[in-house]
Amino acid sequence: MLPEWPAGTVAVLSTAGPHAIPVSTATRAGDRAIHFALAHTRDSLARLREEPRCALTILAAGVAVTAYGTADVVDADDRVAYLRLDVESVEDHDQPTFSLDEGVRWHWTDERAEAGDAEVRAALQRL
């Protein structure tokens, strides 16, 4: 089962290749699904269309998991494709010897990019 994590948490999407990129739109969509968005220009999107198996590693305060499964495009607009990762298994990296105090701290430096991100997140919530 997937844990909860804060909006904007930076996660790492790993696709065939191997190839990995940070994503900040990963949204929990139930116990076994994650929604996220990728720009149409992302190599990762092309890779997922070719080979949908992937892993998403989520690191936030109190959360250290990798979700394994297959991702498919479920919707798109002119800027991004909206994907659903159907989670087959979750590896919990939690250990009794350490604790994650926080995830990656980041912020937008461009107001238009920040507004666009808010629109993408709202669309992900509607999926």
Feature annotation, model-predicted:
Residues 41-98:
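Short, structured beta-strand-loop surface elements
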Residues 6, 52, 73, 124-127:
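Generic secondary-structure transition motif, activating predominantly at the C-termini of alpha-helices
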Residues 75-127:
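C-terminal edge-of-domain segments
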Residues 2-39, 66-67:
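Short beta-strand segments
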Residues 31-33, 49, 69, 105:
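Alpha-helix boundary/interfacial micro-motifs
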Residues 12-16, 39-48, 124-127:
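Short low-complexity stretches enriched in small and charged residues
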